[in-house]
Amino acid sequence: LGEVDIKGIDATGSLSLQPWDKIRINLSGNYTYQRALDVTPPDPNTYESTYKHQIAYTPRVSASGQAGIETAWIDLSYSFLFSGKRYALGQNIAENRLDSYSDHSISANRDFQIRKITTSFSVEVLNLMDKNYEIVKYFPMPGRSVRATIKIRY
């Protein structure tokens, strides 16, 4: 891999609303389309060429989105990540293809103030749909997991 030609588009948006006095809704998302091709001149002595193939681990399409609700009592959020199919090596052949994947996660966060000590408690559910997927070939990502965090600030 020596030269790469990348063309594409990124679109990002966000919106924050406060429909009621103590409730805020935050929405955001982004979309990427990129055509990232290996344009290194092919070596005539090499049988296998990657010329004009999408470069490894670079999906043509990816997207993410977030939605959150902030209240005086608790903050809730949802996030979504999508990555289109991509290839583990420079040759865009079936053996190197990695399927597209999506990941959904949710979280809840609550802050407490006791005298001069602020405590935050959060719970997250990662990979909510418990989908099996690989970001890197032969290295599967964990299934559904729950993470709880307590932070104390004084």
Residue ranges and their predicted role:
Residues W73, D103-S105, T118:
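Active-site lining segments that contact anionic ligands and/or coordinate catalytic metals
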Residues L1-Y87, M129:
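Gram-negative outer-membrane beta-barrel transporters
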Residues L81-L89, R97-D99, A108-Y154:
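C-terminal beta-signal and adjacent terminal beta-strands/loops
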Residues R35-L37, Q91, K137:
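Generic alpha-helical secondary structure signal
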Residues K7-G13, V61-G65, S102-A108, R144-I150:
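Hydrophobic, lipid-facing positions within transmembrane beta-strands of outer-membrane proteins
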Residues V4, K22, T58-R60, D99-Y101, ...:
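Short coil/turn motifs at beta-sheet boundaries
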